[in-house]
Design a protein with these regions (language model features):
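Long acidic/polar interaction regions in large eukaryotic complex-forming proteins
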Residues: 67-72, 88
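Post-HEXXH active-site segment of zinc metalloproteases
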Residues: 94-127
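Conserved aromatic-histidine-acidic binding/catalytic patches
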Residues: 13, 17, 72-76, 80, ...
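Short, hydrophobic/amphipathic alpha-helical patches that form generic packing surfaces
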Residues: 122-134, 168-169
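Pan-zinc metallopeptidase signature
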Residues: 147-202
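Active-site recognition of the HExxH zinc-binding catalytic motif
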Residues: 78-99
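Short helix/loop segments within enzyme catalytic domains
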Residues: 133-150
Length: 202
């Protein structure tokens, strides 16, 4: 949309606009008409590390903050497009009422448990997003093999065959895996295991 650039605020022009990177965002937004309809402002900020890349909804869901790692822009246009597409899919889920996103979710009472559950939750969401994008024939930040490797490292105690079944269900899920469902799975490995049996009561 032609008015998209005026929505961008607080950008480091040297880092972003003068290098023509706004075009990548415009192209990516064209893939997500739902975001353009709902969101009033998009802020692009620098992520301090690759792990800190991500997106957040603020101001009651009217503003998006996308954090991108500066080195991404050295890697070239394809990688920029992949990362932005992946991040905007997170945003698209957040504004989709069927996803049941809760920005105030408290994952656990202790910091260590919070970190473990949050990391699992993020992995499930990344698998869900990259699976949907890959199944549409779109390039994204990680391949099936890469996400499977991450999944294996998180759930190494689950037997290989069972793990493959569970991962496949997440990657090829016909219906969106909701926020609440991912929180449940992140908190309880038995519920993750139950996915292999196809249990909907898990």
């Amino acid at each position: 949309s032609s008015d998209l650039p005026r929505r961008f605020r607080e950008l480091d022009e040297e880092f972003f606009n003068r290098l023509g990177y706004g075009a990548f965002l415009r192209d990516a937004f064209d893939e997500y008409p739902d975001i353009e309809a709902e969101i009033k402002e998009v802020h692009v900020r620098r992520a301090t590390t690759r792990k800190n890349e991500g997106s957040n909804l603020v101001d009651e869901g009217t503003k998006v903050i996308v954090r991108l790692y500066p080195e991404l822009f050295v890697e070239g246009s394809k990688e920029i497009s992949r990362v932005i597409r992946h991040e905007l899919m997170h945003v698209s889920d957040m504004i989709n009422s069927a996803f049941e996103y809760n920005v105030h979710e408290e994952f656990a009472t202790s910091p260590m448990e919070e970190r473990i559950i949050t990391d699992r939750y993020r992995l499930f969401w990344d698998i869900s997003i990259d699976g949907r994008l890959a199944n549409k024939g779109l390039e994204t930040t990680a391949s099936r093999e890469e996400r499977k490797k991450e999944f294996n490292s998180f759930f190494s105690k689950i037997p290989d065959e069972t793990r493959e079944l569970i991962f496949d269900k997440m990657w090829n899920a016909e219906e969106i895996i909701t926020h609440n469902r991912m929180v449940e799975l992140a908190k309880d490995t038995n519920k993750v295991l139950a996915l292999a049996a196809g249990s909907r009561t898990a």
